[in-house]
């Protein structure tokens, strides 16, 4: 209320965020939304969900490249004062539905408190018991929300970072070296097909502060990798561990759960 400009929401998606954002913002006054997705990097269902989206204020664009390429360009747009000034003249301002906007992460923090309360309600734990949380992730957003929940006092022992064949986060959590100079894999869990995990920067900021994080991000941009110091890795290891799996094991897990529980889990949950 009181804002005369129109919000232009830019969304880079590896699959799931795009449809959710389009549906959430369709036909809302003073909002326009543009979603960009990798042309060959989402499932057919995800592509159709976005391409057939109804709404007078929505736009969807397939990009030749992967999610990292798109996310980097969206960040460049946000950091460009020239683009911001030009949009201002036209009556627009930029916003995002990605986790580049912390407003995306804030509601996710609630998931973990709700889950803990459910475990208490079902008498599976008692108040104060610590739990382990396993999150399939590529961009490190939802698992960072779990970490914030832990900082807020939720009794979480270990945050388990589950990766697919693009296992850059697993390598980082085990070695402290983040190296995106590697092969990019298109997998059956496309929402996790990411090599530049933008929310990891936030974790490093929480643990090591602005100056060290800025140095590491500069190295990532210039050289494609960085190595954190031993103290930082030790501190991260107090809360996180990382594991990865391949396509074969992911499919086996889907089959096992369907056979044992008559429940079809999706490919990301299977990771």
Region roles according to the model:
Residues 1-271:
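PLP-dependent amino-acid enzyme catalytic core
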């Amino acid at each position: 209320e009181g804002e005369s400009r129109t919000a232009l929401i830019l969304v880079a998606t590896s699959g799931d965020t795009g449809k959710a954002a389009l549906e959430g913002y369709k036909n809302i006054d003073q909002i326009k939304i543009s979603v960009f997705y990798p042309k060959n990097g989402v499932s057919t269902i995800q592509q159709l969900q976005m391409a057939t989206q109804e709404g007078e204020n929505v736009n969807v664009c397939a990009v030749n490249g992967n999610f990292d390429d798109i996310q980097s360009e969206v960040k460049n747009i946000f950091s460009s004062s020239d683009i911001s000034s030009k949009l201002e003249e036209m009556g627009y301002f930029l916003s995002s539905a990605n986790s580049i906007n912390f407003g995306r992460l804030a509601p996710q923090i609630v998931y973990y408190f709700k889950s803990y309360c459910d475990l208490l309600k079902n008498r599976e734990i008692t108040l104060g018991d610590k739990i382990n949380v396993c999150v399939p992730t590529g961009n490190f957003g939802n698992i960072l929300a779990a970490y914030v929940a832990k900082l807020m006092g939720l009794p979480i022992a270990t945050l388990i970072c589950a990766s697919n064949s693009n296992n850059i986060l697993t390598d980082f959590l085990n070695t402290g070296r983040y190296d995106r100079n590697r092969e990019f894999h298109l997998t059956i869990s496309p929402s996790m097909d990411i090599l530049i995990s933008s929310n990891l920067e936030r974790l490093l900021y929480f643990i090591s502060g602005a100056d060290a994080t800025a140095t590491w991000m500069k190295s990532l941009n210039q050289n494609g990798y960085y190595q954190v110091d031993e103290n930082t890795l030790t501190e991260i290891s107090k809360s996180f561990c990382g594991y990865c799996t391949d396509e074969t094991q992911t499919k086996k897990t889907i089959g096992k759960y369907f056979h044992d529980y008559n429940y079809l889990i999706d490919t990301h949950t299977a990771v």
